[in-house]
Curated annotation (Swiss-Prot):
It comes from Bacillus anthracis. It comes from the Bacteria. It is a multi-pass membrane protein. One of its GO terms (molecular function) is quinone binding. The keyword Cytoplasm does not apply. The keyword NAD applies. The chain crosses the membrane at residues 4-24, 31-51, 67-87. GO terms for cellular component: NADH dehydrogenase complex; plasma membrane. Keywords: Cell membrane, Membrane, NAD, Quinone, Translocase, Transmembrane, Transmembrane helix, Transport. PANTHER family: NADH-UBIQUINONE OXIDOREDUCTASE CHAIN 4L, NADH-UBIQUINONE OXIDOREDUCTASE SUBUNIT ND4L. This is NADH-quinone oxidoreductase subunit K. Belongs to the complex I subunit 4L family. It catalyses: a quinone + NADH + 5 H(+)(in) = a quinol + NAD(+) + 4 H(+)(out).
Amino acid sequence: MSSVPASAYLTLAIILFCIGLFGALTKRNTVIVLVCIELMLNAANLNFVAFSKLGLFPNLTGQIFSLFTMAVAAAEAAVGLAILIALYRNRTTVHVDEMDTLKG
């Protein structure tokens, strides 16, 4: 049984990160922007796990750091959605273009 080469993991991570970056920079819906940021974080996690497993000195450091990053990403998503709900109640929109002032 052959294993998957490291270049396949890194290529997938680059593709995922580029899709997330493109979505975060071009989309105007705040929920979609948050999802794209999560996609970029998951691409970074894939790199951590790939280098941890397939690097010159395989160890668990990358996998542990990936779990820590997933916990931070979950907290970021919860705070982001809470802010989004508060903004929606105040402005009745979730578009990034219309959220330009701090106090309205």
